[in-house]
């Protein structure tokens, strides 16, 4: 059984603290619960723990920019109100065999959400995430501590293109981001939001999940 936590809009710093707290509780109590956190962030840039600062075009000391170096893998990415973000906290029984399977499952989740609107997407060899015609729509980055995962994926719906263009997302030279509403201009954000909520509700009912909303 999976516990689903829905925060709505939450700043990145707070969500990061919440994730780490949940992970360390799981480890300390030797729990193997599955937690899935759904939310949106205000404007923020995050760098993976080994990310290259050359991939950002603004000064990293600029106090007007919300920038954080975090403990996930991957390079730089951008979050804002126009994304659906899913953070999963899951215990991997056999880490060596399950990491690639886990990443593939996260990518499959992103693809299934896009398929709700009959949007075909693909994976790109050596680059985690989901792409539509060489443009990235789903970003992915995870961290594993003692076989317990956290961080997850983000799906672009109506992100600020201007802010996204200030970075070399995931360190890919030709990696251009794309928004869902660029592909489906007839679908409003409200329509997308409610269809997404209905699908989650069906999944919740079928899986008998516990749901906590904030």
From Swiss-Prot:
The record marks 136 as: Lowers pKa of active site Cys. Keywords: Acyltransferase, Chloroplast, Plastid, Transferase. The keyword rRNA processing does not apply. InterPro entries: aa-tRNA-synth_II/BPL/LPL (IPR045864), BPL_LPL_catalytic (IPR004143), Octanoyltransferase (IPR000544), Octanoyltransferase_CS (IPR020605). SUPFAM superfamilies: Class II aaRS and biotin synthetases (SSF55681). It holds the Pfam family LplA-B_cat. GO terms for molecular function: lipoyl(octanoyl) transferase activity. One of its GO terms (biological process) is protein modification process. It is an enzyme of class 2 (transferase). It comes from the Eukaryota. The keyword Magnesium does not apply. The active site is at 170 (acyl-thioester intermediate). It catalyses: octanoyl-[ACP] + L-lysyl-[protein] = N(6)-octanoyl-L-lysyl-[protein] + holo-[ACP] + H(+). It is found in: Plastid, Chloroplast. Residues 30-214 form the BPL/LPL catalytic domain. Its main location: plastid. GO terms for cellular component: chloroplast. Substrate binds at residues 72-79, 139-141, 152-154. Its EC number is 2.3.1.181. PROSITE patterns: BPL_LPL_CATALYTIC, LIPB. Pathway: Protein modification; protein lipoylation via endogenous pathway; protein N(6)-(lipoyl)lysine from octanoyl-[acyl-carrier-protein]: step 1/2. Belongs to the LipB family. Catalyzes the transfer of endogenously produced octanoic acid from octanoyl-acyl-carrier-protein onto the lipoyl domains of lipoate-dependent enzymes. Lipoyl-ACP can also act as a substrate although octanoyl-ACP is likely to be the physiological substrate. In the reaction, the free carboxyl group of octanoic acid is attached via an amide linkage to the epsilon-amino group of a specific lysine residue of lipoyl domains of lipoate-dependent enzymes. This is Probable octanoyltransferase. The lineage of its organism: Eukaryota, Rhodophyta, Bangiophyceae, Cyanidiales, Cyanidiaceae. The gene is lipB.
